Amino acid sequence: MTKVLFITANPNSAEGSFGMAVGEAFIEAYKNEHPQDEVVTIDLFNTTVPAIDADVFAAWGKFAAGEGFEALTEVQQQKVAAMNTNLETFMNADRYVFVTPMWNFSYPPVVKAYLDNVAIAGKTFKYTENGPVGLLEGKKALHIQATGGVYSEGAYAAVDFGRNHLKTVLGFVGVNDTEYIAVEGMNANPEKAQEIKEAAIANARELAKRF
């Protein structure tokens, strides 16, 4: 059975977000097309996603020195345990669907924190004499991103840092089979916002058949 992580990073629901509306349409279509698969929703705004901070570095230092989990402070244990849960869930999945808005040329900070939780040496990638090698080969990902302007092509494509960073990190851990759906231009062309949304939903439903 294929396991799909539906990873969202938006404080708004589908009623208040173009991207979430497209994401929900995709995942519902996917469930209809693949009823045997397991879909797990991860709302990053309602999930414990520790940032790499002094506590995490201190915990990693203790592990490197040969100390065990019991040597960590209570706060360090809580953060490491949450990070390990996020990592194990990510490693055990076969498909990833990220739904994010663009905020100031990137995605919400919690997405970066989540990627820091799951891009871990020895777990999702390893270092070799020929360079780093991803360990999650054979998996697939989709990124659905909503932007007020147009960033998928043209002069502003170079500053679509969220899309580029996510694709880079996924490739680094071995997930090179990626798809992208742009839900874009709603603020630049407000009179076409509904049309843009409906076109993206149609695209998402079609992609769900072969994802």
Curated annotation (Swiss-Prot):
Record-listed FMN binding positions: 102-105
Subunit structure: Homodimer.
Catalytic activity: 2 a quinone + NADH + H(+) = 2 a 1,4-benzosemiquinone + NAD(+); N,N-dimethyl-1,4-phenylenediamine + anthranilate + 2 NAD(+) = 2-(4-dimethylaminophenyl)diazenylbenzoate + 2 NADH + 2 H(+)
Protein name listed in UniProt: FMN-dependent NADH:quinone oxidoreductase 2
InterPro entries linked: Flavodoxin_fold, Flavoprotein-like_sf, FMN-dep_NADH:Q_OxRdtase_AzoR1, NADH:quinone_OxRdtase_FMN_depd
Pfam families: Flavodoxin_2 (PF02525)
Family label: Belongs to the azoreductase type 1 family.
Protein purpose: Quinone reductase that provides resistance to thiol-specific stress caused by electrophilic quinones. Also exhibits azoreductase activity. Catalyzes the reductive cleavage of the azo bond in aromatic azo compounds to the corresponding amines.
Recorded superkingdom: Bacteria
Enzyme type, top EC level: oxidoreductase
Keywords: Flavoprotein, FMN, NAD, Oxidoreductase
Cofactor note: Binds 1 FMN per subunit.
GO molecular function, one term: oxidoreductase activity, acting on NAD(P)H, quinone or similar compound as acceptor
Keyword NADP recorded: no
Cofactor: FMN
Organism whose genome encodes this protein: Bacillus cereus (strain ATCC 14579 / DSM 31 / CCUG 7414 / JCM 2152 / NBRC 15305 / NCIMB 9373 / NCTC 2599 / NRRL B-3711)
EC numbers: 1.6.5.-, 1.7.1.17
